[in-house]
From Swiss-Prot, chain B:
[4Fe-4S] cluster binds at residues 46-47, 112, 141. One of its GO terms (molecular function) is iron ion binding. HAMAP family: NDH1_NuoB. The lineage of its organism: Bacteria, Pseudomonadati, Bacteroidota, Flavobacteriia, Flavobacteriales. This is NADH-quinone oxidoreductase subunit B. It is a peripheral membrane protein. One of its GO terms (biological process) is electron transport coupled proton transport. The gene is nuoB. It comes from Flavobacterium johnsoniae (strain ATCC 17061 / DSM 2064 / JCM 8514 / BCRC 14874 / CCUG 350202 / NBRC 14942 / NCIMB 11054 / UW101).
Length: 412, 182, 173
């Protein structure tokens, strides 16, 4: 049986031949293949199993490798934003804003306070969408389909807010160097207020379905735990690390875009198991809602939404047609002939899954010399074989869902 | 009631009498197949999230007969390929398509599945029609749920008008042979 | 008490003398270069020292510089982070162009396992002592290293791209 699935020189084939159980049963190999209903995204795991228990796992990734880093070496800076969208596509505004902040650090541009607050609002909305998907799909994997249908309605509401701001639903390509491409319409603020009214009761209902639910607790408590030391050694960041007990959050450690003005706690779990990850994400949604409310209250007056950097920010069309300098700036920006210093920058933002870093090395030309994305999913997925050792097969599925591995970010 | 904008589906052409309705086999089979297409969601990347939005309550795809998504190829009618297919993934896509039983249809959702999309690189397959025959292409990056539903409706038109004998006809066998699918 | 750049520089030069050099503050991250054979000792020192405490490996990646001299054609960049003092540090190691190899740090930081595999996959840099150095993102059968500058981005097997529409003529491509 094992000859059909594995080449005989594979490590698992040798283990199966050598090991004999007392009751005469053999070990088996299961291919949790790239296309599987419960794995969200395509990654393969070859599992060595003893009945229903998993002894070892061998992951294979790269089934959606789109060579982002190679593409980025051939594109001017503005054209790299659509690439960043498609990494963690559940919360694409965070990726976009992270990229713009990296460029602003490179070019030494100071973004006005109001634009920073607007960025904070959009990033927290994106974090809410990411956690909505992760937690509701975790619910679907344990068999509770209703929660997914209820909260997905609110993802539609957030999509409507994105459409008011930038025109797109999922892959937003939002913002420009120095701020936003247009000011937010009053309709966007109205929809945001309506969302802030309607969402909290729905999220409370969603939480009540799961947090004290006997079946959910049986399936998730003490499943897939990881200690804090192990998590730090494996490079965990984000909600997965905070569930293990370490309160590292990039928004607090290296505040960016005025996060230091806001008052929020960083929820931390205890044992790092699936239930803790679920609860940490739930609590983070409440914190994000509180940050959005604070940002709306403290929003500075006026309507400036971008920095005054004519070298990098497209001038308004009326000026392009009527004034010579604007025409020249427009031409230079579109052609990519903008002054770029030679430098190396590393900037990190707190993405939905952890520390999303951008390492940019320029050489003065219109495209980056080297752009590397520090993708949190890629780094913490290494711990997955260790987390499922000794677990049942259905537990492995739950652990994978709760880690929130997004294939676009895994392979880039 | 009579001036409402609701489009009533009309029965196929045929002879009606007391207690019987005679029509062509093709029409009845086409009607039955078109309104019960079970999808196999082959979701790889961002278009998969828009598919989840299409299956959710707002843009319910289940109204069109796709109530039960089947992840087993043997039990699915249409293969919805959503997202970028890389060259590493192409043999697996091929295997899934070959395991599907006739009649089977393929919708390529999104720019990446139709033609490689924005990723013109060494590792991305430039369109799934390099490995499997495709019936409907839905462009967009990602396409809105309304567009995906439109793609499914176009497929329904195709299915309604398809002949029952098509799958054993020499043209179809030639099409499969051109993709090296036995 | 915050960790100052001068403090780091002094501690490192007194332990490693001439194997660490070119200390400078690149924008907001303190950067230094190191020589390839001392890298494991350097990283272990940075992790275990009670003052420096750079206990988290943020990132590991490679860069290709085909225009440099042959001893500095490839670079491996390590980003380390100290969460207690919120301090980041970047270490660059330049490698030979013909045979780029460097010792692995996967026994010091478990998270560097896949990052080194990715760097091998893209650049062909050999990590000596790595438990499983094979390709991770590309197909296993691939022979060339795609992120090197001489490798083309586009799929060379395409037949349906009409060069006229892309402005490609015999003279410019």
């Amino acid at each position: 049986m094992s000859e059909l699935l594995l080449p005989p020189e594979h490590r698992y084939a040798k283990i199966i031949k050598e090991r004999h159980n007392e009751d005469g049963s053999e070990l088996s190999v299961l291919n949790l293949g790239p296309t599987h209903p419960a794995t969200h995204g395509i990654f393969q795991n070859i599992l060595l199993m003893d009945g229903e228990r998993i002894l070892e796992a061998e992951p294979t990734i790269g089934y959606i490798h789109r060579a982002f880093e190679k593409i980025a070496e051939n594109r001017p800076f503005y054209q790299i934003t659509p690439l960043t969208d498609r990494m963690n596509y559940c919360s694409s505004p965070i990726n976009n804003m992270g990229w713009w902040m990296t460029l602003e650090k490179l070019l030494g541009i100071e973004v006005p306070k109001r634009a920073q607050y607007l960025r904070v609002i959009v990033m927290e909305l994106a974090r809410i969408t990411d956690h909505i998907i992760c937690n509701s799909i975790l619910g679907v994997d344990t068999g509770a389909y209703t929660g997914f249908l209820y909260v997905f309605q609110f993802r539609e509401k957030i999509y409507e807010i994105y459409e008011e701001i930038c025109g797109a639903r999922l892959t937003t390509n939002m913002g420009r160097i120095g701020g936003f491409e247009r000011d937010w319409s009053p309709e966007a603020f109205r929809k945001l207020d309506k969302f802030l009214e309607e969402f909290p009761p729905a999220w409370k209902e969603f939480e009540n379905l799961f947090e004290r639910n006997r079946i959910f607790l049986d399936r998730t408590v003490n499943v897939g735990g990881i200690t804090a030391e192990k998590a730090m050694a494996y490079g965990f960041t984000g909600p997965n690390l905070r569930a293990a007990g370490v309160d590292y959050d990039v928004r607090v450690a290296h505040p960016y875009s005025s996060y230091e003005d806001f008052d929020f706690i960083v929820p931390v779990g205890k044992s790092g198991d699936t239930y803790d990850r679920f609860c940490v994400r739930n609590a983070e949604v409440w914190e994000s809602l509180s940050i959005i409310r604070q940002a709306l209250e403290k929003m500075p007056e006026g309507n400036e939404y971008h920095a005054e950097v004519p070298d990098y920010y497209l001038p308004p069309k009326e000026d392009v047609y009527n004034s010579m300098e604007s025409l020249i700036y427009h031409f230079k920006i579109v052609m990519g002939e903008v002054p770029v210093p030679v430098s190396e920058i590393y900037h990190a933002v707190e993405g939905g899954n952890g520390e999303l870093g951008f390492y940019l090395s320029t050489d003065g030309s219109r495209t980056p010399y080297r752009l590397h994305f520090r993708r949190p999913c890629f780094i913490y997925y290494q711990a997955f074989p260790e987390m499922i050792k000794g677990a049942l097969l259905s537990d492995a599925i739950i652990i994978l869902s709760s880690l929130n591995v997004i294939a676009g970010e895994l392979d880039a | 009631m009579s001036d409402s904008k609701v489009n009533m589906v009309s029965p196929p052409e045929g002879l009606t009498g007391e207690g019987f309705f005679a029509t062509k086999l093709n029409d009845v089979v086409g009607l039955a197949r078109a309104n019960s297409l079970w999808p196999l969601p082959f979701a790889t990347s961002c278009c998969g999230i828009e598919f989840m939005a299409t299956m959710a309550a707002h843009y319910d795809l289940a109204r069109f007969g796709s109530e039960r998504v089947s992840f087993s190829p043997r039990q699915a009618d249409m293969l919805l390929v959503m997202g970028t297919i890389s060259k590493k993934m192409a043999p697996i896509l091929r295997q899934v398509y070959e395991q599907m039983s006739e009649p089977r249809w393929v919708i390529a959702v999104g720019a990446c599945a139709s033609s490689g999309g924005v990723f013109d690189t060494y590792s991305v397959l430039q369109g799934i029609d390099k490995v499997i025959p495709v019936d409907v292409y839905v462009p967009g990056c990602p396409p809105r749920p309304e567009q995906i539903v439109d793609g499914v409706m176009r497929l329904q038109e195709l299915v309604k008008s398809e002949s029952v004998r098509r799958r054993s006809s020499p043209e179809y066998q030639e099409l499969l042979a051109s993709y090296n699918i036995s | 008490m915050a960790l100052e750049n001068t403090q780091i520089q002094n501690k490192l030069t007194e332990t490693f003398n001439n194997d660490v050099f070119n200390f400078h503050e690149e924008r907001d991250i303190f950067t230094l270069e190191a020589s390839a054979d001392k890298i494991t000792a350097l990283i272990l020192f940075l992790k275990n020292d009670s003052e420096l405490q750079f206990h988290f490996l943020t990132d590991l990646c490679g860069i290709h510089y085909p225009d440099n001299e042959s001893e500095r054609q490839f670079a491996v960049v390590y980003h380390l982070h100290n969460w207690f003092e919120n301090k980041r540090i970047r270490i660059k190691v330049y490698l030979n162009g013909e045979k780029p190899e460097i010792k692995t740090i996967s026994n010091i930081f478990l998270s560097s396992n896949w990052m080194e595999r990715e760097t091998y996959d893209f650049y062909g840099i050999d990590f000596i002592g790595h438990p499983q150095l094979k390709r991770i993102l590309n197909m296993d059968e691939m022979v060339s290293f795609p992120m090197r500058k001489e490798f083309p981005m586009e799929d060379s097997g395409r037949t349906d791209k009409d060069d006229r529409f892309f402005g490609r003529t015999v003279s410019n491509c």
